Amino acid sequence: MVKKIEAQGYLERFLQTQMAGLTGHMKEAGYPYDSVEWGMPDVPPPIKGQTVWWRYEQTAYWTDGYVRCAILLGDEKHIENAKRIIYNVINHPIGTYLGPEIIRECEPGEEGACRWAHVVFFRACMAMYEYTKDEAIPKAMVAHYLNDTADYGKMRNVLNVEILLWLYGITKNEELLKLAQTSYDRFNLNAKQDACDTVALSPKKPHEHAVTYNEYSKLGALLYEATGKEEYLKASISAFDKANRMFMLPGGCVCSDEYLESNHYYHSIETCNITDMTWSLAYLLRITKNPKYGDWIERCIFNGGMGAVTEDFRALQYFSCANQIISDGQSNHNDYVKGSGWMQYAPNPGTACCPGNVNRFMPNYVSNLWGVEEDRVYCYTFGASTFRCEIGGRSVTVKEITDYPVVEQVTFEIETEAPFTLYYRYPSFMSNCRVTVNGKRIPKGKKSVFNGIAIEKSCRVTLSFESEVVAHTKKDQIYFTKGALTYSLGMIGERIPEYEEGKTFPKYRMYADQPWNYGIVSAEAAYTPVEGFEGFDLTKPLPYLTVRGIKISNYRLQTLYRFKMCVEPKSYKMRDVVGKHVFTPRLVSPKRAKTEGEIESLRLYPYGAAKLRMTVFTKLCEACLTKEKGKA
């Protein structure tokens, strides 16, 4: 699908910025990106204590994002470099095995994960095949799988089921389907972790590595697509419904401060999961045609995704949180590796997976905007783009003009030689939808299905959505959304750049440069739209909400000199840390809050534009404040 979609508007500008940032200059992130590449004949030995496949997993993340970004931009220079990387592997098998020779044999203790890096790299091969239609790519991949002796019935090797089923869809080779089914079924028969069908279909709250959970939970839907067996699909649907219900955070992604923990606002999103969750949900959206998955994808990309990277795409966070008003080399307030720099904006802020995986989330989003099945064209999620396809051998072009989700209107300019049906979502977070064809109003659709418009000839279709500001309250907490966007009290902050030797992309120490210690006194909010949206950047025009708040004098940065840090999230093994650290504090309860000054009007901007931000606030009682002042 990549070749048929051209990014435009804000999405194109973002991809251009991405390529000018880390995606096109990945060596700035350091090891392993500065010395290891798939298809490279000579690489340094692995770092002592590190699994052999680990560095190839990270560089494969980058490769996939890089390939897709280059193709979507039509950047010939980078497309040629992407081809070089892919064909260095495809054209140089070891027998039939594809990939680095050093990970051909599974090292002791890694028999269940030694082929995980291949899943990541083969996604880049999938993108290149979709662009070139070169049959040499799937042919080499099929030979690799059907002659490999690795055990695909173990975690994370079982994730190769995704690639096996993609190959089956192209070749219809029954051996691939059999390998996918037997591997998946054998894994579930012996699974000892919470990423499995038994837990997905049970009431149990899963405690699982979030990346593993997001990657695994799509496989059932893919097997359903290949086999028609409903039991496979039920597991995937249940797994993601459970994650949405138990772990969803204000930034639109599940809690993933390494493991799934809860939906408490103080938990963070690991940036890898912005990519992995939305990649998996795109499969479910396409297979089930349930629009809710599109809603979830948009919330995640335009809040959590935008909020985890700097405006120039030269730095990212490993952990990103709804509330973060300090970001430096010691500010990670999550229990896991607490006091580390994993919440700092840097080219490589923690371990190397996120610097690679961050390159994938927007290219994946754009490449999954559109789909076509027979004479049905689906706009799965919204974004400025041009989609081209053929129906019955005749050309169809749909140009989507929009600044969605900042501006809630989408126009499709359609040029077609063939009749078809255009299907669109009516997002659940919209309160109204006005649909016109060539200016003539037609009935709006439903939120629970994809809605079809019969297109007989070239025309112009406009979707004009309306959304309401929603105040989300939980106990004594409150935050605000409108449409797909979450809103935050955001600030650029004082940014102090720091450069590592030989690098030109800095990491930042960021500190609040304006008051942030407010409680909210009313659930009412006024919306001000934007004219001339340019991007998620506080220095540029943005929509905002105006809310009423008051300062809380005893709500301050948290300074600790001794605390517990989790060093193993599965068992929650802890150790002591000694030394001064400053953290974003938890909210003060209304009973403990000491207010000062007068009630103020506060502007909340899109979460994704705010790198330092307060999103979730203490909810105060305005009448109680007035009563207290009367007593004074």
Residue ranges and their predicted role:
Residues 88-91, 121, 127, 186, ...:
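Glycine-rich, acidic and aromatic/proline-enriched surface loops and short helix-turn segments
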Residues 420-423, 451-472:
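C-terminal beta-strand-rich structural cap/linker in extracellular carbohydrate-active enzymes
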Residues 430-452, 469-475:
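Solvent-exposed beta-strand/loop surfaces of large extracellular or lumenal domains
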Residues 149-151:
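Solenoid-like repeat scaffolds
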Residues 1-76, 108-131, 158-175, 179, ...:
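Aromatic (Trp/Tyr) and acidic
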Residues 15, 236, 295-303, 308-410, ...:
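C-terminal beta-rich recognition modules with glycine/proline-rich loops and embedded aromatic residues
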Residues 28, 35, 76-114, 119, ...:
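Helix-terminus loop motifs that line ligand-binding clefts
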